[in-house]
């Protein structure tokens, strides 16, 4: 059971949320007094409490979602709060639904969406994974961070062929290596205020690192927001090549490292927005004519469940008319379906741009 000091902090946090009339987070929407009272004394076997789940959203009242899972068990123990938030965010994934088993499908279905190279600047597909038997960031010890890093770096160093590369630990990284990784846009920084408030950045930079292959088309982030972020990317629009590279990497890593998986929710991640397939397939794309008609762009994107962001990701503007467009859905469909939906949408957007 959670101790008195934690419960006191929780009570204060709940009062703060209640008083914040302009707060629009899903946490505020679904943390009723009844749910709060039901969960405030609970504790996972690794010692995580409701405070670990909600503290980022309490501190940052402008959060969109406002909760994180401190460990895998939290998704079950605190399900009266997680489930409605998951259903709301992953539109259409009801509390009775079950996420399908992993299925990359026939990877040869995927093509170069822009063979002429006129519109798509680059293509990227990523997924997140958590290592079984370890909690998520807020509950990890420094020793666990280092142990996980050792397991992951030895697994990655055994990769061959196109995936063969080098692991760069953040600890003790030289200025030259650091600058090189910044220039390649590979380096991740210590978490933003949302992650900081969730206690996701403790013992930084212990156990954190970056692996990339020699061609710089395959990248793994170790212990950033998630235990593993596996990323495949390249210039141009060859989604087929990018997706095939990602799937072969995931399959290789999976042989050596068991991943956290939930019967109903799919692959588990620190943030509930990434659950399920955890897959985000995106392009940086120039659509000058459609961009001039943002409503039309959003309408078509909506039809294919695509998310339109600015060039530098969330909360940014489109620089030089270049957008970051990706699949929105992660849950209740397979990896294959998620990427196929994105491919269909991008092909449709390019077709419209040509016809305008």
UniProtKB/Swiss-Prot annotation:
- Which of the residues bear the PTM N-acetylalanine? 2
The residues that the entry says bind ATP are 122-126, 185, 229, 280-284, 309-314
Q: Name one Pfam family in it.
A: ATP-gua_PtransN
Substrates-to-products reaction catalysed: L-arginine + ATP = N(omega)-phospho-L-arginine + ADP + H(+)
Where would I find the Phosphagen kinase N-terminal domain in this sequence?
9-91
- Key word Transferase present in the record? yes
Q: Does the keyword Transferase apply?
A: yes
Query: Alphabetically, which GO biological process terms does the record hold?
Result: phosphocreatine biosynthetic process; phosphorylation
Q: What class of enzyme is it?
A: transferase
Q: Name one GO molecular function term.
A: creatine kinase activity
What are the protein's UniProt keywords? Answer: Acetylation, Allergen, ATP-binding, Kinase, Nucleotide-binding, Transferase
**Which family, according to UniProt?**
Belongs to the ATP:guanido phosphotransferase family.
The identity of this protein, by name, is Arginine kinase
* Species in which this protein is naturally found: Penaeus monodon
What gene does this protein come from?
Answer: AK
């Amino acid at each position: 059971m959670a101790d008195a000091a934690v419960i006191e902090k929780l009570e204060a946090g709940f009062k703060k949320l209640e008083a914040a009339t302009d707060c629009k987070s899903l946490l505020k929407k679904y943390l009723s007094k009844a749910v709060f009272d039901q969960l405030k004394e609970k504790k996972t076997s690794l010692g995580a409490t409701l405070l670990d789940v909600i503290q980022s959203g309490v501190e940052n009242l402008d959060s969109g979602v406002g909760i994180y899972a401190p460990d895998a068990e939290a998704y079950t123990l605190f399900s009266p709060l997680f489930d409605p938030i998951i259903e709301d965010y992953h539109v259409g994934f009801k509390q009775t639904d079950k996420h399908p088993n992993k299925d990359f499908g026939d990877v040869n279905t995927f093509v170069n969406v822009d063979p002429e190279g006129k519109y798509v600047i680059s293509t990227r597909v990523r997924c997140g994974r958590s290592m079984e038997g370890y909690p998520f960031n807020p509950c990890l010890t420094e020793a666990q961070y280092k142990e996980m890093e050792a397991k992951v770096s030895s697994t990655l160093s055994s990769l061959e062929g196109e995936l063969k590369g080098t692991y760069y630990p953040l600890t003790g990284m030289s200025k030259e290596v650091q600058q090189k990784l910044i220039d390649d846009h590979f380096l991740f920084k210590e978490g933003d205020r949302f992650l900081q408030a969730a206690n996701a950045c403790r013992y930084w930079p212990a156990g954190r690192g970056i692996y990339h292959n020699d061609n710089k088309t395959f990248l793994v982030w170790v212990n950033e927001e998630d235990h593993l972020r596996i990323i495949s990317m390249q210039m141009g629009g060859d989604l087929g090549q990018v997706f095939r590279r990602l799937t072969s990497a995931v399959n290789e890593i999976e042989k050596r490292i068991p991943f956290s998986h939930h019967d109903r929710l799919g692959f588990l991640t620190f943030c509930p927005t990434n659950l399920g397939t955890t897959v985000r397939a995106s392009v940086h794309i120039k659509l000058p004519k459609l961009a001039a008609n943002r409503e039309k762009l959003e309408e078509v994107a909506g039809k294919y469940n695509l998310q339109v962001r600015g060039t530098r990701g969330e909360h940014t503007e489109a620089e030089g008319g270049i957008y970051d467009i990706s699949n929105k859905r992660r849950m209740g469909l397979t990896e294959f379906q998620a990427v196929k939906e994105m491919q269909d949408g991008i092909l449709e957007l390019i077709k419209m741009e040509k016809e305008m």
